[in-house]
């Protein structure tokens, strides 16, 4: 199977996995969404494991949790670090939305929802590229993922030491 045909044959699954993340209102700026931050981090670990990571974990921090995952192909291979964030901005003012902000809608060939682009969509593109590389036998490097939940409020995590070397 080619890369293009793998992606095409799995497109619906890829979209549903993305939509499951978008439906979680992981708004880092709102204290009432704190439980959603953990839920979203846990969902990312599930997606990463099902996509081919050898391990994935939610790491507690002083703020919102960090998702760490890795796929090690060889101790001698180079390592690529993939960064994304799972937190989103508040959706207000709600009256400006044509649809519910946390219920993804495909309109005119585009996904409309809070987090569809910044940054859950981008994170999913990276993860599904990783999955496709594994399935097609193309992955020749180690891959580590760091997904954090404080980018939208100033990356407070980075005032602390890195959670992993």
Task: Please annotate each region the language model reported.
Residues 9, 50, 135-136, 165:
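Secondary-structure boundary motif
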Residues 151:
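Active-site-proximal loop/turn and secondary-structure-junction residues that shape catalytic pockets
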Residues 158-165:
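Conserved small/polar residues in nucleotide/adenosyl-binding loops
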Residues 58, 70-71, 101, 133-136, ...:
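Short, flexible, glycine/charge-rich loop motifs used to bind or transfer phosphoryl groups or to couple energy/partner
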Residues 1-94:
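N-terminal helical capping/dimerization or prosegment-like subdomains
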Residues 77-147:
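Active-site metal-coordination/substrate-binding segment of hydrolases
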